[in-house]
């Protein structure tokens, strides 16, 4: 489980970091300025998407261990968390708050779910965090052009260059990962 988790972390981390760092810019450059808010939504949803991607393939462990009741409890917790988030966002009349609460609540549930899977599989938590940390470092290096861009004034040309460099670095990282997987 820890090995699969690490591979999934290496796959999911770069796009998550790109969205978390530059979601509004990606959406506004790609679709126009009126889509900027969708990029803000994507920023809030990035951690949740990451955790779903690295956790969902491991969820078959519930069936293997015949712990379907635990999966039902997880789904109930997830449903309750999401309902509370949406109701609170509606009560406050703030769409962004609703999306943020929904996403952060879902991410928290999936994090607990991931910790349960790691524990149930007999793996040490440190093994999975080590893999996540490695993925974070490599992804941080891959998206470093976007990080550098935040230190300079906004300019659409610079954003384009940063996105291009980031795309090349992420693609290079994926090629290295695929080469290792096929050896």
What residue spans do the PLM features occupy?
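Specific pore-lining/lateral-gate transmembrane helices of multi-pass inner-membrane transport
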Residues: 1-76
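Hydrophobic alpha-helical transmembrane bundles that constitute the permease/transmembrane domains
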Residues: 4-7, 13, 17, 49-57, ...
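Alpha-helical transmembrane segments
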Residues: 7, 41-44, 58-66, 98, 115-130, 132, ...
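Membrane-embedded alpha-helical segments of multi-pass transporters/permeases
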Residues: 16-24, 29, 41-44, 83, ...
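Generic alpha-helical secondary structure signal
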Residues: 24, 33-36, 96, 126-130, ...
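Membrane-proximal transmembrane or re-entrant/amphipathic helices at the cytosolic face
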Residues: 120-136, 144-183
């Amino acid at each position: 489980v820890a090995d699969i988790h690490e591979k999934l972390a290496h796959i999911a981390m770069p796009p998550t970091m790109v969205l978390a760092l530059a979601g509004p810019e990606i959406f506004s450059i790609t679709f126009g300025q009126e889509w900027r808010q969708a990029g803000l939504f994507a920023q809030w949803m990035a951690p949740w998407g990451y955790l779903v991607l690295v956790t969902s393939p491991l969820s078959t462990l519930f069936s293997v261990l015949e712990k379907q009741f635990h999966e039902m409890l997880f789904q109930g917790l997830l449903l309750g968390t999401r309902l509370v988030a949406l109701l609170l966002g509606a009560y406050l009349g703030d769409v962004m708050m609703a999306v943020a609460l929904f996403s952060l609540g879902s991410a928290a549930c999936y994090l607990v779910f991931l910790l349960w899977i790691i524990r149930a599989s007999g793996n040490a938590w440190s093994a999975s965090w080590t893999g996540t940390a490695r993925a974070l470092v490599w992804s941080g290096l891959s998206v470093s052009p976007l990080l550098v861009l935040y230190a300079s004034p906004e300019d659409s040309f610079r954003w384009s260059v940063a996105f291009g460099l980031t795309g090349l670095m992420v693609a290079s990282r994926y090629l290295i990962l695929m080469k290792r997987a096929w050896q």
